[in-house]
């Protein structure tokens, strides 16, 4: 690693030491830029706080990792990578197999059964091979310990304190490469190490100390029952080992704390004995123990453990060789109880006003309440390595750490959240962003756990169930403002909703899962953290990004970031699909460019940032975007097998505009939940449709594993989060086929507009994750489309045609194996308006049909003209329905279709009339929306 100013770290992925640093980078550093060959990280106070909260890395370990793996000016590191790899394997094997007693320090002595101290067999030779000096030191120290067998443990602990070197020093071959840390980084580590650590601990309530009354055994039995009830009750306590510091904090937090009546005196701070079960009596194993043995000096790790072990053994057996459990380490702490429901307020005030980061953890092993026996993963579940790593961070030390887990879209965040719930095995409540996400979580809980359908309940508009062992609902359902209507006047549905929400707020919950946690920063969503009585909260997100710079509030609202996966690493491992990203630049036709420039008037100070309605409409309804989308749809429709395409458009008018011209179904904010579910199911499982248009409702919590192509027409300004979320819709790996080797992400931008700069900003975060964008011109896409026989759709006035037997007039054209006669423009406009409105048909009178050419069959019939149009439900664009030319005559029924059928028609070349019509329609839509105050996006 290369250490830069301000805690910046640059990593070369090709260096052989990179695999050994991945765990350190994930746990202790914040990713800034992770590309294919080089990554940039930063060490900040927040990342160090998250590392200490997770519990694996101490500041001494962080310091040693940087010192021993830092490149010097000659591009050399102090350790030999091969020796370090061999040492790491030995340590890992000794951790997994307790019979392999790898010494914690150089030359550790081993005590035999008869009390003699002997050098450990099998380790001396390996030690001498790694360091000749170590072997000599070992022999001398063995003699020293053997000389005083009765004080072997005390001598051993003294020797360790004198030799404070971590195991990683055995792999050092280039001592000249060891460099001191920069002053700013050393100061940062020292502040984190020496700062007063304040914790918020969920633990049993304080037991009242009472004298035993003279009243007899019955009263004593009642007191014992009350005492057991008090022990099972949990509460949050603000704890600190420094009494003065604690009293200072309490003086600023009395609004959220509960005083204790002790010996007739009300006290805000009480002392207690912290037995430290979670830190001292629980044996470390696995990853944490391996890392501590490698990078922590024996004086701070092994020495304490050996000394405490000697005290324990001597206390149990008297001769120092027993295996019983003796005295435990204790210490005095000072605590103050937090009011119910005010824990978040305490953390927020500590962080914002007092600059104190309070760690929060939940000892779910000691808590026997809210237990759900069936909440465990099914036998057929096999978690992926990164999911296991994230859950290890969550349950480090057999305690549930509150925080955020960041995994890419399509990487299995839902299953990871289910794994967290199965770890604590407590009643769980899940908060989702929308109804589709609620139903998805319900299906996944039933699929991956042993829970029955009755145990997993939901509360949405169309399906309301009382809370079960696992309860799933939306943020908006829980915090919605409801009118104060008398209970007698409420409907049955309103009463049921009130009953469910009251039950949610009254019942305690073991785990609160926040899906898409970056949305929980909104003011209303923060109310969820106060309304739900949870013991531990975990946030899940794919993009921990917000453009309002409030993402840092997650540190005190939810907790530190426990784990963040590398997108490129998951792609290389095959867990995510490989994605080809392209930016297609589309020029503006002259008429559209004129309107865009006119909207940049001096009278509107915001116009140059592209915030006017006209500017948004011009760049969204750009005809070149429409034609490029048509060309891309045709290209991916002809692949083997055909690709499923998602088209994203944020503007309301744009969604309907593209849906009408491309004949593709769309889904926006007005689409009902039932229609959304049916449309998505039809899109995933039907071969008749390969594309769908989505508004902003499809950005998050939308599971469409079949999709492999995204075409983005417009977006929410320069939102990096939206860009990443939309790309995440196609990250699910697909079965290999002839053409399906990767996924495709296209973003269409209008040249010479604000979209160029916004697009570059939107792509910045994905570029930092290793994705690259190819810049293409629309001419290249359209030339390929036209060369393969494609025909661009018309943006001019709607053209409707009816079928005829032959070329009975000059305007008849041959297409689709027959002849077609055009309707008049007035008739076409009426048919188009009815068709767009979803009406099943319309009548055309003689006045409307004035300029429409008649077929030969209607000549000299002498009847009043009234044509009846009936639109088709499912056959477009092959046929759009039928028209009955004469009422009651089934022989005069003709098919109708829409679109430019004339071969010579081309809006791209010489279609000025069509472009002018498109501009006029755009102006009408902008004026209508401005008058009705319709928002730009939905």
Curated annotation (Swiss-Prot):
Residues 627-781 form the Helicase C-terminal domain. It is an enzyme of class 5 (isomerase). The keyword Nucleotide-binding applies. It catalyses: Couples ATP hydrolysis with the unwinding of duplex DNA by translocating in the 3'-5' direction; ATP + H2O = ADP + phosphate + H(+). SMART domains: DEXDc, HELICc. GO terms for biological process: nucleotide-excision repair; transcription initiation at RNA polymerase II promoter. InterPro entries: ATP-dep_DNA_Helicase (IPR050615), ERCC3_RAD25_C (IPR032438), Helicase/UvrB_N (IPR006935), Helicase_ATP-bd (IPR014001), Helicase_C-like (IPR001650), P-loop_NTPase (IPR027417), XPB/Ssl2 (IPR001161). Residues 394-562 form the Helicase ATP-binding domain. Keywords: ATP-binding, Helicase, Hydrolase, Isomerase, Nucleotide-binding. CDD domains: SF2_C_XPB. A motif (DEVH box) lies at residues 515-518. One of its GO terms (molecular function) is 3'-5' DNA helicase activity. Signal peptide: none annotated. It comes from the Eukaryota. ATP binds at residues 407-414. Component of the 7-subunit TFIIH core complex composed of XPB, XPD, SSL1, TFB1, TFB2, TFB4 and TFB5. Belongs to the helicase family. RAD25/XPB subfamily. ATP-dependent 3'-5' DNA helicase/translocase; binds dsDNA rather than ssDNA, unzipping it in a translocase rather than classical helicase activity. Component of the general transcription factor IIH (TFIIH) core complex, involved in spliced leader RNA (SL RNA) gene transcription by RNA polymerase II. TFIIH has an essential role in transcription initiation. When the pre-initiation complex (PIC) has been established, TFIIH is required for promoter opening and promoter escape. The ATPase activity of XPB is required for promoter opening and promoter escape. This is TFIIH basal transcription factor complex helicase/translocase XPB subunit. It comes from Trypanosoma brucei brucei (strain 927/4 GUTat10.1).
């Amino acid at each position: 690693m290369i250490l830069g100013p301000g805690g910046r770290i640059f990593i070369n992925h090709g260096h052989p030491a990179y695999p050994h640093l991945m765990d350190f980078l994930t746990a202790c550093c914040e990713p800034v830029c992770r590309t294919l060959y080089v990554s940039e990280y930063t060490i900040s106070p927040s990342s160090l706080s998250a590392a200490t909260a997770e519990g694996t890395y101490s500041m001494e370990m962080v310091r040693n990792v940087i010192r021993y793996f830092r490149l010097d000016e000659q591009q050399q590191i102090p350790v030999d990578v091969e020796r370090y790899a061999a040492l790491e394997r030995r340590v890992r094997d000794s951790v997994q197999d307790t019979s392999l007693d790898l010494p914690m320090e150089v030359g550790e002595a081993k005590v035999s059964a008869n009390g003699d101290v002997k050098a450990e067999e099998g380790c001396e030779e390996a030690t001498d091979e790694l360091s000749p000096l170590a072997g000599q030191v070992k022999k001398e120290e063995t003699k020293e310990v053997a000389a005083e067998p009765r004080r072997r443990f005390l001598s051993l602990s003294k020797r360790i304190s004198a030799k404070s070197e971590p195991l990683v020093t055995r792999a050092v071959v280039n001592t000249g490469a060891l460099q001191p840390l920069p002053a700013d980084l050393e100061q940062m580590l020292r502040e984190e190490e020496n700062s007063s650590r304040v914790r918020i601990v969920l633990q049993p309530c304080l037991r009242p100390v009472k004298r035993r009354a003279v009243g007899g055994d019955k009263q004593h039995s009642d007191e014992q029952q009350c005492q057991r009830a008090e022990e099972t009750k949990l509460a949050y306590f603000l704890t600190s080992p420094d009494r003065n510091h604690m009293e200072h904090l309490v003086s600023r937090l009395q609004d959220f704390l509960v005083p204790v009546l002790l010996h007739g005196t009300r006290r805000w701070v009480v002392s207690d004995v912290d037995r430290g079960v979670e830190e001292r009596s629980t044996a470390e194993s696995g990853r944490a123990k391996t890392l501590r043995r490698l990078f922590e000096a024996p004086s701070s790790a092994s020495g304490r453990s050996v000394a405490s072990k000697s005290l324990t053994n001597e206390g149990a057996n008297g001769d120092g060789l027993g295996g019983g459990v003796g005295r435990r380490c204790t210490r005095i702490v000072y605590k103050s109880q937090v009011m119910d429901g005010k824990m978040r307020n305490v953390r927020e005030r500590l962080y914002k006003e007092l600059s104190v980061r309070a760690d929060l953890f939940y000892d779910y092993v000691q808590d026997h309440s809210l237990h759900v026996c069936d909440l465990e993963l099914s036998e057929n579940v096999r978690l992926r390595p990164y999911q296991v790593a994230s859950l290890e961070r969550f349950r480090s030390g057999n305690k549930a750490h509150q925080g955020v887990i960041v995994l890419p879209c399509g990487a299995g965040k839902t299953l990871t959240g289910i794994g967290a719930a199965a770890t604590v095995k407590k009643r769980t409540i899940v908060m989702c962003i929308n109804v589709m996400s609620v139903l998805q979580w319900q299906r996944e809980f039933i699929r991956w756990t042993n829970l029955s359908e009755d145990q997993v309940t939901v509360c949405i508009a169309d399906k309301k169930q009382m809370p079960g062992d696992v309860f799933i609902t939306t943020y908006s359902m829980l915090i919605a403002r409801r009118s104060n209507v008398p209970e007698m006047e409420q409907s049955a549905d309103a009463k049921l909703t009130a009953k469910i929400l009251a039950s949610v707020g009254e019942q305690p919950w073991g785990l609160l899962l926040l899906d898409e946690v970056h949305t929980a920063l909104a003011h209303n969503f923060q109310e969820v953290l106060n309304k739900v009585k949870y013991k531990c909260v975990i946030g899940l997100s794919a993009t921990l990004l917000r453009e309002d710079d409030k993402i840092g509030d997650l540190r005190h609202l939810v907790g530190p970031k426990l784990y963040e996966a590398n997108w490129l690493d998951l792609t290389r491992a095959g867990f995510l699909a490989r994605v080809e990203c392209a930016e297609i630049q589309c020029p503006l036709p002259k008429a559209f460019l004129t309107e865009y420039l006119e909207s940049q008037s001096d009278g509107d100070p915001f116009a140059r940032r592209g915030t006017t309605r006209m500017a948004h409409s011009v760049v969204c309804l750009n005809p070149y975007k429409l034609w490029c989308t048509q060309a891309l749809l045709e290209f991916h429709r002809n692949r083997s097998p055909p690709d499923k395409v998602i088209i994203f458009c944020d503007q309301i008018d744009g969604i309907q505009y593209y849906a009408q011209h491309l004949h593709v179904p769309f889904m926006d904010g007005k689409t009902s939940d039932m229609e959304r579910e049916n449309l998505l199911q039809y899109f995933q499982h039907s071969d008749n449709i390969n594309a769908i248009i989505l508004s902003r409702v499809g950005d998050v919590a939308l599971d469409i594993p079949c999709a492999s192509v995204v075409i983005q027409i417009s977006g929410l300004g320069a939102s990096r989060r939206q860009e990443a979320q939309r790309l995440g819709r196609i990250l699910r790996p697909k079965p290999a086929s002839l053409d399906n080797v990767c996924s495709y992400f296209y973003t269409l931008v209008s040249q010479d507009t604000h979209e160029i700069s916004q697009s570059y900003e939107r792509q910045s975060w994905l570029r930092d994750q290793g994705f690259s964008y190819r810049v293409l011109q629309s001419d290249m896409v359209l030339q390929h489309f036209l060369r393969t026989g494609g025909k661009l759709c018309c943006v001019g006035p709607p053209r409707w045609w009816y079928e005829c037997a032959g070329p009975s007039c000059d305007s008849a054209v041959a297409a689709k194996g027959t002849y077609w006669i055009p309707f008049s423009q007035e008739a076409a406009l009426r048919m188009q308006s009815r068709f767009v409105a979803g009406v099943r048909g319309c009548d055309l009178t003689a006045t409307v049909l004035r300029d429409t050419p008649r077929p030969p069959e209607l000549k000299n019939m002498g009847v009043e003209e009234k044509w009846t149009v009936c639109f088709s439900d499912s056959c477009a664009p092959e046929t759009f329905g039928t028209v009955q030319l004469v009422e009651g005559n089934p022989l005069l029924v003709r098919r109708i279709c829409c679109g430019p059928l004339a071969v010579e028609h081309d809006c791209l070349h010489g279609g000025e009339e069509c472009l002018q019509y498109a501009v006029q329609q755009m102006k009408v839509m902008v004026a209508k929306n401005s008058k009705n105050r319709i928002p730009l996006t939905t």
